[in-house]
Amino acid sequence: MRINPTTSDPAVSIREKNNLGRIAQIIGPVLDVAFPPGKMPNIYNALVVKGRDTLGQEINVTCEVQQLLGNNRVRAVAMSATEGLKRGMDVVDMGNPLSVPVGGATLGRIFNVLGEPVNNLGPVDTLTTSPIHKSAPAFIDLDTTLSIFETGIKVVDLLAPYRRGGKIGLFGGAGVGKTVLIMELINNIAKAHGGVSVFGGVGERTREGNDLYMEMKESGVINELNLADSKVALVYGQMNEPPGARMRVGLTALTMAEYFRDVNEQDVLLFIDNIFRFVQAGSEVSALLGRMPSAVGYQPTLSAEMGSLQERITSTKKGSITSIQAVYVPADDLTDPAPATTFAHLDATTVLSRGLAAKGIYPAVDPLDSTSTMLQPRIVGEEHYETAQQVKQTLQRYKELQDIIAILGLDELSEEDRLTVARARKIERFLSQPFFVAEVFTGSPGKYVGLAETIRGFNLILSGEFDSLPEQAFYLVGNIDEATAKATNLEMESKLKK
């Protein structure tokens, strides 16, 4: 006789509604689960193991089906530690892929790969969830317009502009200002575009993730007193997590970003740090599943895995996801399959320079090494393109002359070269900019500089309009008018000292 599920015990109704299997084998984070004939779960379905270990501690492990082995067995990868599991334990097939909370309630919170909040602020106030596995948007829904994504950061907008709905690689070592640049981008997209950001820490160091969270609270990007005012949702899969969690945490972050784009129709900024660790986790899982390794020991499905993530990051007619991905290059070998596969998807690269950071020029974006496919006259217009090329030529000439200056001094240069060096030094300083998120540390107010203002400023420097002004006037200012005002102040100060 069938018991009415509305009156029956909830545990019984769960068993009725879901297929129940048993653990047949455990090898590290990989579980083989036997199901009754005809009750096999689909690939990517979530499986949940609940019970108690030998010490009586509660166990709640979520896994994801990766392979159907035959003989009514499936192979699944655990999203958390498998300590305490044993053969014969009950496994519930949830009937769907992993689903995570989405929407405005996720802002200001830190989540793990399963979408569970981990920053002790109580449960997430949303009933809306979304599966982490989805198809990329259909061709008919894509917005193929090539448009610039204005960041308000002069060096980025002028020399290596970001594409709306594009993918940007962020290359930078420790201590060159990567975190501050990320936070400023999060702040600016919220103010200028009414957009939000999602940060996916893939294989992050726990300390780095904690530092980022603390700095975001300090700079106002996260407002714990009023979470609705926060501008970012954080999703972390740390280095100590099993490979399954590190492989899927990028998809969790992307799913949250997709909801803001498709349902809220917003422009979204998605940060992935580090995209290499996503590949690395996939490689570990591939080996655990017994697949034959490909070149340099990577998984044979490397391109497909990367493509399934990257193709979902795009502009649609409703909104856009612009992604900034930190890229680690193993042993500085750009031909390594992991970075080589990543490069195929990037529209722009932002390279941070330790030399510029040492000079105190922030953001320390290298103007000559950073590139963008958007810097073409037909996309950005003739004036922008010509200005950017002249700025690069001036800086390149200054770089070539630096050895001569170091050995012989400025006096040995021709009049033309001396002028080039003077303008290049002004340009170098004018590429610096005070950030909103650094106000609490520097005391100087942040500046958002529109693209038209940026182009006007650099054109005036290149034309020789400001050859008479001191180079200090161009350091850490917003637009060119602030530089002229600063020059006047410097002149008055020097007169008063005399």
UniProtKB/Swiss-Prot annotation:
Keyword DNA repair applies: no
Physiological role: Produces ATP from ADP in the presence of a proton gradient across the membrane. The catalytic sites are hosted primarily by the beta subunits.
InterPro entries membership: AAA+_ATPase (IPR003593), ATP-synt_VA_C (IPR055190), ATP_synth_F1_bsu (IPR005722), ATPase_a/bsu_AS (IPR020003), ATPase_alpha/beta_chains (IPR050053), ATPase_F1/V1/A1_a/bsu_N (IPR004100), ATPase_F1/V1/A1_a/bsu_N_sf (IPR036121), ATPase_F1/V1/A1_a/bsu_nucl-bd (IPR000194)
GO terms under cellular component: chloroplast thylakoid membrane; proton-transporting ATP synthase complex
Keywords: ATP synthesis, ATP-binding, CF(1), Chloroplast, Hydrogen ion transport, Ion transport, Membrane, Nucleotide-binding, Phosphoprotein, Plastid, Thylakoid, Translocase, Transport
HAMAP family: ATP_synth_beta_bact (MF_01347)
Entry's localization field: Plastid, Chloroplast thylakoid membrane
SUPFAM superfamilies named among the record's database cross-references: C-terminal domain of alpha and beta subunits of F1 ATP synthase (SSF47917), N-terminal domain of alpha and beta subunits of F1 ATP synthase (SSF50615), P-loop containing nucleoside triphosphate hydrolases (SSF52540)
Keyword Glycosyltransferase recorded: no
Topological relation to the membrane, as annotated: Peripheral membrane protein
Positions contributing to ATP binding: G172, G173, A174, G175, V176, G177, K178, T179
Main location: plastid
Swiss-Prot/TrEMBL catalytic activity: ATP + H2O + 4 H(+)(in) = ADP + phosphate + 5 H(+)(out)
GO MF term list: ATP binding; ATP hydrolysis activity; proton-transporting ATP synthase activity, rotational mechanism
The protein, known as: ATP synthase subunit beta, chloroplastic
